[in-house]
Structure formats: C-alpha cells, structure tokens
Amino acid sequence: MRGIYLVGTDTEIGKTVISAALVYILCKAGYKTAYFKAALSDAEELNGKLIPGDTEFVCSLSGIQEDYEKLTPYIYKTAVSPYLASKIENKPIDIQVIKDKLTKLENEYGYVLCEGSGGVICPITDVDNKIYTLGNLIKDMKMDVILVCRAGLGTINHTVLTVSYLKNNGIEVKGIIVNQYEENRLCKDNINMIKKMTGIPILGVMPYINENKKNFIEELKYNACNIFKADEIAGLMKEV
C-alpha cells in the first residue's frame, strides 16, 4: 500500500481541486486509489445528513464509490476550522479513529491520497494541553508530502516557511504543485524563486480556473491529464 499527504501553504489555495485532479488521473490510469480527509467542516446538511463537500467533489470527479464517512471520519457543519468545529459541536476528534480509518483504507486500496485539513501546523486536537497537529499525524503515519501553493503574491514566504517546517520535523516534501497560475511576471518569478529557495521539484503548474464556469469540470480534467503524469505521482507515494 502506498500513500502520500497533500498539504497546502494557506487556506483557499485549491487543495481539494488539486487532490481531485491527482486522484482522477491515478484512477483513470488504472491505479486503485482512495481519497482521505481526516476532518472537514462547513458541511451542508441534506435530509438530516451532513455531506462533506470536498469528499463529494473528489469522489464525483474520480469515480470513487465509497461511503463518505469512510473517507472522512469527522464531518462538521460549523464554518470554522475542524478543530474548533469539534469543540463548538461537542463532537471530539479521536486521533486513533483517524489512524485506524486510514490504515483500513490503505489495506483495501493500492494507493491513498490524503488531503490535509488545514495547514501542516493546524491543530487537530488539544487534549490536556497537548496539541496534536496535522504535521504530527503525517509523521505518525510515516508519510511524505506533496505541497500545494498559490502562484500569486505572498506565496514565496508561505511556501519556503512551510517547506522549512516540514524538513525540520523530518517530513520529506516530494514535490510542489503551483495552483491558480496566471500568465504574468509576478507568477513566473514566484515559481522561479520557490524552486531556487527550496530546491524542491515543481510537479506541475495548474492555471487559474473559475469554479463557477459552466465547463469547470471538463477544463479541470483536461488540465489534469495534460499537466500531471499518473506514473510519476504514483511513484512518489511511499510504501506504508
């Protein structure tokens, strides 16, 4: 079983879009791949049941047919971080449950792509003044990371600091994916500086796609197939 964690440098940078793109090309190429997101907030309620939008989107795009609760153990309605939502809704997160669910997926599928719930330093739990972060989970599960960053203003600082934190905590960054790229001098220079300052390979550059466009899904699939190579992504996944 092979897996990898996809982590973002900031909020609203399109981790789920990139996750969906990667899972889509892996499944399309014949790799039996699952998607996993430990906790999700801001879920919509439908017929008395919470629907994890990110998980629904990835499954819809890639064709994965699984119960959402199997892929996302903790689902919250409140539109704050999953950690805070768990406190507000009095539904605590159990780290062991997350680990067990992920291990079960790893045993059922050949490949698992995990999407981080927030950034690498974001807390998942705070029990008895012991803060457990996404980074702790990644390290405990012995996984490597693909880092997603935005192309625009501010990305150099966010990306270099995140890479530094991951390296200092013994987590290997296998590559960087630049999202929301626009054809201008700023974005080009940002990518060049990120390569120079981190020494991490750029796995792909995804152009900005308006999610409200009528043909958003078709455009995302087209770009995914033209930007990423399934064999390369699968090869980055560490045996766990």
Swiss-Prot record:
One of its GO terms (molecular function) is ATP binding. ATP binds at residues 12-17, 54, 115-118, 179-180, 207-209. It is an enzyme of class 6 (ligase). It comes from the Bacteria. The keyword Magnesium applies. GO terms for biological process: biotin biosynthetic process. Its cofactor is Mg(2+). It is found in: Cytoplasm. The active site is at 37. It catalyses: (7R,8S)-7,8-diammoniononanoate + CO2 + ATP = (4R,5S)-dethiobiotin + ADP + phosphate + 3 H(+). Substrate binds at residue 41. Pathway: Cofactor biosynthesis; biotin biosynthesis; biotin from 7,8-diaminononanoate: step 1/2. Pfam families: AAA_26. InterPro entries: DTB_synth_BioD, P-loop_NTPase. One of its GO terms (cellular component) is cytosol. Its main location: cytoplasm. Its EC number is 6.3.3.3. Homodimer. Catalyzes a mechanistically unusual reaction, the ATP-dependent insertion of CO2 between the N7 and N8 nitrogen atoms of 7,8-diaminopelargonic acid (DAPA, also called 7,8-diammoniononanoate) to form a ureido ring. This is ATP-dependent dethiobiotin synthetase BioD. The lineage of its organism: Bacteria, Bacillati, Bacillota, Clostridia, Eubacteriales. The gene is bioD.
